[in-house]
Amino acid sequence: MTLEAIDVHHGYGDETVFDGVSLSVSPGEVVAIIGPSGVGKSTLLRLFALFDSPDRGSITYEGSDVWSVSENHRLDIRRQIGMVFQDASLFDASVKRNAEYGLRVRKPWSERIRHELASIVGRTNGTGPAVEALETVGLDDKLEQDATSLSGGEAQRVAFARALAYEPDVLLLDEPTSDLDPRNTAVLEEAILEARERGIGVAVATHDMHQAERIADRVAVLLGNEILEVGETETVFEAPRDERTRKFIDGELIY
């Protein structure tokens, strides 16, 4: 269930964003994609989420090129990939209904029925996949609260729970804590680590290198249209192979 970018070239018009980028996200690991703002971290996540197709190279899932398979197969793959954007978008409904949304639209019919039944039972006994996901982010005490009344940090936690509830194979997070206070940041980081323990592969795009050190098993350094290096987090931070990586980590490179 590995999601992988292989020698990906991508751009918009005359602007080159990636010139031969390769990166994998495997089950049960957290990969942090670090780099300054505007370098293409979000674009890489969009490619992983199958929102965009690369100009050259391939995105593969379980070894199959996702843009070479049938549309129905690609839709099945999309259902295995969850994404949480930087700015959470919630509906005018309860916290629980927002967390259930992914179960209703992302799963095949057979799975939707199973999760809907679990959700109905959960309304009487306080369980179910959405409730369990909300417990993970510490919001199971706000199930019936209007989601639009939540703080920004709480809304981001609901968005994470919504993606987690339908049990994706891969979870993509785009600067998930960039505007959050320390408490909400800590809750989400703990939830990310719990997702890893469940066997979910997690890719986090972040400019916060301290966060990458706290939660990531591996780090990919994205600078200047390419990934300079990928490696175990401690190794990249303590003994980077590329001099540009060292300068970026030390704050000597300004983009």
Predicted regions and their residues:
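Conserved ABC ATPase "signature" region
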Residues: 107, 112-142
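Conserved ABC transporter NBD signature motif
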Residues: 57-68, 77
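Helix-to-loop junction immediately C-terminal to a conserved catalytic motif
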Residues: 49
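Catalytic Walker B motif of ABC-type/P-loop ATPase nucleotide-binding domains
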Residues: 171-174
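A short, proline-enriched helix->beta-strand linker immediately N-terminal to the Walker B motif
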Residues: 165-169
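A short, surface-exposed alpha-helical micro-motif characterized by mixed small hydrophobic
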Residues: 212-214
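ABC ATPase C-loop
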Residues: 158, 163-164
